[in-house]
């Protein structure tokens, strides 16, 4: 996304409902073959990796990091839908991992 447009969006009052968010995910899945969506997800995860690396080295910026985190988050939602993973299954798996993290 164009950086200026992203910043303008952050400063706007846009707030999608859960239904609108789910519809956007469905539209993305219906527009492109599932393998292409998976490839896009991998690319977005790589961009997040690069942005985190920049943060570690002191060259990153907060807006860039947020944008890549959100892209990766959206891609996770796409993958959940593509691979038919229910919100309940995701939450249970998150709880298992968080419990392990909590005990460290």
Tell me what each language-model feature is.
Residues 2-69, 73-104:
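Flexible "arm" and connector segments at domain edges
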């Amino acid at each position: 996304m164009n950086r200026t447009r992203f910043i303008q969006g952050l400063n706007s009052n846009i707030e999608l409902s859960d239904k609108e968010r789910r519809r956007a995910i469905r539209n993305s899945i219906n527009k492109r073959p599932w393998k292409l969506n998976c490839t896009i997800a991998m690319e977005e995860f790589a961009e997040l990796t690069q942005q985190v690396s920049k943060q570690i080295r002191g060259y990153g910026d907060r807006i860039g990091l947020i944008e890549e985190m959100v892209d990766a988050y959206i891609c996770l939602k796409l993958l959940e839908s593509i691979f038919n993973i229910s919100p309940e299954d995701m939450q249970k798996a998150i709880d298992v991992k968080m419990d392990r993290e909590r005990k460290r």
